[in-house]
């Protein structure tokens, strides 16, 4: 079972999981980055993009989406079988932005999926290079996590919108594999399971027959992934209960919501990786940098160094603040949507604001938006320090937390105490400890009650100067604890809509 002693590093998940040493892992991840870079260079040639246009993040997103769609076999099969008007199942495309006579113009391009697949494979030495595709999915997911607060999705499944810090990876496609599962938050897994159980309640045949067997094994697999994220025996035992249920129903939904709430204090292990847009990797490869030879890691200094030396541009709407747009993308690049803003401000070297205070909408431009008033500007993606990404939830303690988001999910392995609003979280746990999971519930509540405010997480870990590549001199930051720590504070972020 996934959680029992088979903890693999994300790089191993990203590299087909053979046990490899650090150098092999770095080379293997580098090879994946090379492939994305080469593909992007080729696509810029196909689309006749200038250097500036190729570094435009909106063009990068369109190209990334095209290749993801070209390899989405289930959807492609579905489109073939259910032809819809005006949609060619064999083609993929999107908006490409070009600078014409001093104005930005939108051009809709359409390509054969077969052609895109050919270009992708050619850039990846003939392989399908699924890991490169997953890498782009995680970048899109991180961008969504930073841009949207999934209030509606949480409410629909019976959870509380203040639990948004558990929702990392909630927009990742099902096909994102082990690397995708590693970056999903506890709330995301709970939401997927609840949706599944609800279908089973409404559809008598969901668990039955040949298909039902597949459904059941998917259900158990998801339970095991979630179990592997929990760090306490009681939370894991609860997941065993949910997994072994003969006929999952409302009792299981209750247990899942309970375990999600408990994760606000007894945080799960969620992986974090810095996945950058293709328009960062492309120019680096074009300049002659050999990622495979030099080696690359998604969780160390490498993405920070790469961003220090990259030029990325973005379209800006008339009333948007380019600095705010930069913050949004910077947070997405480091998978830091649910990290403590005080720590982010320290690492970035400029103040990082809550989502609701940002004068910026998402990065993507809708097809009905007016291009005449669009400007473009440079995204400031550099940082003052770098820090190691974590896959642990850190341990817990109490802090004044905000109305909008009542806990954090740490991204960086840096010493601090983690803010959460204990009274708010605990208020959700009154009463209901009866039923078959009563002993586990009581145990979980006891542990949460015991979480101490003064406890420090990631003791002794610090941030590093960008010149300190080997991470030899940790700098432990000191924080002004009176500042607001959470990003989705009493917020008005847009909703994410599929």
Curated annotation (Swiss-Prot):
Does Transferase show up as a keyword for this record?
no
Return the motif ranges for Unconventional nuclear localization signal: 1-18
Concerning InterPro entries, the annotation shows: Flu_NP
Entry's localization field = Virion; Host nucleus
RNA-binding found in the keyword field = yes
Q: Where is this region: Disordered?
A: 1-21
Q: Which GO terms describe its biological process?
A: symbiont entry into host cell; viral penetration into host nucleus
**Which cellular component, as a GO term, is one annotated location?**
host cell
For this UniProt record, the keywords arranged alphabetically read as follows: Capsid protein, Helical capsid protein, Host nucleus, Host-virus interaction, Ribonucleoprotein, RNA-binding, Viral nucleoprotein, Viral penetration into host nucleus, Virion, Virus entry into host cell
- Per the Swiss-Prot or TrEMBL annotation, the motif Bipartite nuclear localization signal is positioned at 198-216
Give me the stretches of Basic and acidic residues compositional bias: 8-21
PTM per Swiss-Prot/TrEMBL: Late in virus-infected cells, may be cleaved from a 56-kDa protein to a 53-kDa protein by a cellular caspase. This cleavage might be a marker for the onset of apoptosis in infected cells or have a specific function in virus host interaction.
* Annotated GO MF terms: RNA binding; structural molecule activity
What biological function has been recorded for the protein in this entry?
Encapsidates the negative strand viral RNA, protecting it from nucleases. The encapsidated genomic RNA is termed the ribonucleoprotein (RNP) and serves as template for transcription and replication. The RNP needs to be localized in the host nucleus to start an infectious cycle, but is too large to diffuse through the nuclear pore complex. NP comprises at least 2 nuclear localization signals that are responsible for the active RNP import into the nucleus through cellular importin alpha/beta pathway.
Q: Which family does it belong to?
A: Belongs to the influenza viruses nucleoprotein family.
Q: How does it assemble?
A: Homomultimerizes to form the nucleocapsid. May bind host exportin-1/XPO1. Binds to viral genomic RNA. Protein-RNA contacts are mediated by a combination of electrostatic interactions between positively charged residues and the phosphate backbone and planar interactions between aromatic side chains and bases.
The identity of this protein, by name, is Nucleoprotein
Q: Which organism is it from?
A: Influenza A virus (strain A/Guangdong/38/1977 H3N2)
Organism lineage reads as: Viruses, Riboviria, Orthornavirae, Negarnaviricota, Polyploviricotina
């Amino acid at each position: 079972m996934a959680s029992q002693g088979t903890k693999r590093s994300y790089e191993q998940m990203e590299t087909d999981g053979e046990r490899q040493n650090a150098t092999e892992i770095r080379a293997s991840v580098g090879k994946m980055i090379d492939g994305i870079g080469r593909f992007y260079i080729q696509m810029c040639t196909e689309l006749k993009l200038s250097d500036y246009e190729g570094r435009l993040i909106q063009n990068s997103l369109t190209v990334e989406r095209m290749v993801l769609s070209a390899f989405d076999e289930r959807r492609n099969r579905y489109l073939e079988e259910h032809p819809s008007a005006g949609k060619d199942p064999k083609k993929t495309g999107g908006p490409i932005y070009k600078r014409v006579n001093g104005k930005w113009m939108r051009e809709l391009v359409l390509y054969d999926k077969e052609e895109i697949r050919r270009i992708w494979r050619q850039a990846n030495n003939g392989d399908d290079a699924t890991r490169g595709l997953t890498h782009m999915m995680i970048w899109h997911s991180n961008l969504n996590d930073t841009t949207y607060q999934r209030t509606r999705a949480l409410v629909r499944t019976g959870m509380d919108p203040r639990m948004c810090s558990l929702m990392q990876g909630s927009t990742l496609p099902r096909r994102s594999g082990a690397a995708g599962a590693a970056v999903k938050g506890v709330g995301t897994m709970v939401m997927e399971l609840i949706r599944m159980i609800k279908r089973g309640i409404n559809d008598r045949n969901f668990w039955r027959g040949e298909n039902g067997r597949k459904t059941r094994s998917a259900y158990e697999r998801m339970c095991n992934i979630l179990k592997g994220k929990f760090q306490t025996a009681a939370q894991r035992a609860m997941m065993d209960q949910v997994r072994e249920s003969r006929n999952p129903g409302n009792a299981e939904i209750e247990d899942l919501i309970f375990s999600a709430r408990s994760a606000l204090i007894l945080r799960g292990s969620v992986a974090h990786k810095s996945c950058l847009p293709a328009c960062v990797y492309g120019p680096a490869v074009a300049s002659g940098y050999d990622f495979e030879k030099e080696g690359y890691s998604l969780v160390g200094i490498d993405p920070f160094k790469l961003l220090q030396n990259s030029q990325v541009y973005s379209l800006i709407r008339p009333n948007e603040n380019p600095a705010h747009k930069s913050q949004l993308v910077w947070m997405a690049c480091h998978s830091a949507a649910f990290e403590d803003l005080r720590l982010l401000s320290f690492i970035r070297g400029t103040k990082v604001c809550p989502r609701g205070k940002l004068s910026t909408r998402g990065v993507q431009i809708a097809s009905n938006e007016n291009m005449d008033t669009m400007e473009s500007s440079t995204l400031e993606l550099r940082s003052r320090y770098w820090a190691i990404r974590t896959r642990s939830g850190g341990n817990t303690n109490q802090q004044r937390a905000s109305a909008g988001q009542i806990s954090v999910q740490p991204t960086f392995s840096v010493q601090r105490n983690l803010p959460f609003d204990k009274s708010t979280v605990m208020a959700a746990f009154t009463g209901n400890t009866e039923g078959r999971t009563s002993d586990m519930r009581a145990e979980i509540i006891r542990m949460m009650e015991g979480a101490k405010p003064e406890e420090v997480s990631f003791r002794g870990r610090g941030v590093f100067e960008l010149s300190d590549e080997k991470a030899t001199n940790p700098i432990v930051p000191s924080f002004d604890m009176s500042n607001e720590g959470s990003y989705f504070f009493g917020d008005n972020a847009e909703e994410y809509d599929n």
